[in-house]
Amino acid sequence: MRKFVFLMIIETIHIILKILIIVIPLLVAVAYLTLAERKVLGYMQARKGPNVVGVYGLLQPLADGIKLFTKELVIPHYANLFIYVAAPVLSFTLALIAWGVIPYDKGVVISDLKIGILFTLAVSSISVYAILMSGWASQSKYAFLGAIRAAAQMISYEVSIGLIIITVILCVGSLNITEIVLAQSSGIWFFFPLFPVAMMFFASALAETNRAPFDLTEGESELVSGYNVEYASMSFALFFLAEYAHIILMSCLTTILFLGGWLSPIVFFKGGPAWFGLKTSFIILLFIWVRASFPRMRYDQLMALLWKSYLPLSLAFVVLVASLLFGLNGLPPS
């Protein structure tokens, strides 16, 4: 009995350490992504960005974190207290859970599920509930309208993302994320044969994460700040962390599905987490560049882009890829 309890304790400690090894670097990455975004936007707009706190502003995320987490938690008088507080916690928790199946290298993953890509899509889809909860519980018309917009936008573009993922799955024959990466080890990443699909996935990822030019949920001239307008201090910080964790997650998925994950683009260089980080950083830089370069779309244009363009195109690519694979050499083994 004692041996069993001892083994259970050891196993629990092992699981906690694996989770912390993933979560702590992720939180640091999210913190410094905010600084990187402000710096890049600053240089694109002919200014320097944050450069006062620490050397070259490197301590700015720490200062922002201390400021937000030490402020008073202000709860609106008519808000539903439990749902109001639970929404940012749920959003942040789901943003972390999705990382449980993301491999940084072969074997470097918390849980290498056989249905890993489906798990990631499912967890990402559930996050829309946290946004709806925040908009409804705030008892604010601006927050509620922002939440409805966000829900409609995220649910719509998840359809496109799902069909695009099916296209890649057809080429691989597996829902396992590690196998999706290894299927590209022959030297041809899926970005090249599936270039239009990759472009649609990136645009859908922008819409899924509510980023410019699809940031209709926080149109300052209309909704002040969107679904989180009534949030401040720690609760606002949790929404903020969840949003940027989701951006990094979608960048990682783009890298995994179309850019070969941790595989090296140069034959005589060994692949690894460094290559995975470089490719993901490049996709994140594209997110920031798009924000600095393109104006916000109208809401009707946003919805028309999906339902009239991306949905038929992504469905057509599913049929085309399946037909080509079946006609030429048969579908990959399941």
Swiss-Prot record:
GO cellular component: mitochondrial inner membrane
GO molecular function, one term: NADH dehydrogenase (ubiquinone) activity
Keywords, ordered alphabetically: Electron transport, Membrane, Mitochondrion, Mitochondrion inner membrane, NAD, Respiratory chain, Translocase, Transmembrane, Transmembrane helix, Transport, Ubiquinone
Catalyzed reaction equations: a ubiquinone + NADH + 5 H(+)(in) = a ubiquinol + NAD(+) + 4 H(+)(out)
Protein location: Mitochondrion inner membrane
InterPro entries from the UniProt entry: NADH_UbQ_OxRdtase_su1/FPO, NADH_UbQ_OxRdtase_su1_CS
Listed PROSITE patterns: COMPLEX1_ND1_1, COMPLEX1_ND1_2
Sequence intervals crossing the membrane: 4-24, 82-102, 115-135, 161-181, 187-207, 222-242, 247-267, 268-288, 311-331
Lipid bilayer topology: Multi-pass membrane protein
Pfam annotation, one family: NADHdh
EC number per UniProt: 7.1.1.2
GO annotation, biological process: aerobic respiration
Assigned protein family: Belongs to the complex I subunit 1 family.
Role summary: Core subunit of the mitochondrial membrane respiratory chain NADH dehydrogenase (Complex I) that is believed to belong to the minimal assembly required for catalysis. Complex I functions in the transfer of electrons from NADH to the respiratory chain. The immediate electron acceptor for the enzyme is believed to be ubiquinone.
Family matches, as HAMAP family: NDH1_NuoH
Protein name, entry field: NADH-ubiquinone oxidoreductase chain 1
